[in-house]
Regions:
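Receiver (REC) domain switch/output surface
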Residues: 1-5
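C-terminal end segment of the histidine kinase catalytic
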Residues: 6-10, 138
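Intrinsically disordered or compositionally simple regulatory linkers and C-terminal tails
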Residues: 10-25
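Short, Lys/Arg-enriched anionic-surface-contact patches
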Residues: 23-33, 75-84
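Recognition helices and adjacent regulatory flanks at domain boundaries
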Residues: 29, 37-41, 64, 118, ...
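Basic, amphipathic alpha-helical hairpins
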Residues: 37-49, 69, 73, 90-99, ...
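Basic/polar phosphate-binding segments, predominantly the helix-turn-helix DNA-binding elements
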Residues: 51-81, 105-127
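Terminal helix-turn-helix DNA-binding modules in bacterial transcription factors
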Residues: 71-111, 133-138
Length: 138
């Protein structure tokens, strides 16, 4: 059971879509994750968006948010924010070839394109440019 949970968390983390159904096995967790995801997506271009703002918008204690997200996703709140930013970037790279890397970096809340590229490569093991070429050829 624990191994299945870990596999699902890894699958959620690695796939480019945001699909909370993979992670949740009850309606309360699904609603919780939908709300967290919605808040992060609404603030995705906000460079200053932080865990503190997520906590305030969720209306729960920081430790409660941390514990619940860690249990469901296997990630800390800041890691989840980064994961969702990078998933959006992957989507934009695939579906918006007219946007350059700097524009995608801005639209996903990164202050600097170089930092965005570094984070993207760490997550997907390929640069944003290479990911775009790979995805467009498919």
């Amino acid at each position: 059971l624990v191994n299945n949970r870990i596999m699902l968390q890894e699958k959620f983390s690695k796939q480019p879509q945001i699909n909370t159904l993979i992670l949740t096995n009850n309606i309360l967790d699904k609603k919780f994750m939908d709300k967290v995801t919605e808040i992060i997506e609404n603030e995705i271009d906000n460079v200053n968006f932080s865990v503190d703002q997520l906590v305030a918008q969720m209306g729960i204690a920081r430790t409660k948010l941390f514990t619940k997200l860690k249990a469901i996703t296997g990630q800390t709140p800041s890691d989840l924010i980064m994961t969702i930013r990078l998933k959006r970037a992957a989507y934009l790279l695939k579906n918006n070839p007219e946007l350059n890397i700097s524009e995608i970096s801005d639209r996903t809340g990164f202050s600097f394109p170089k930092y965005f590229s570094k984070c993207f490569k760490k997550k997907y093991h390929v640069t944003p440019q290479a990911y775009r070429k790979e995805e467009i050829q498919i």
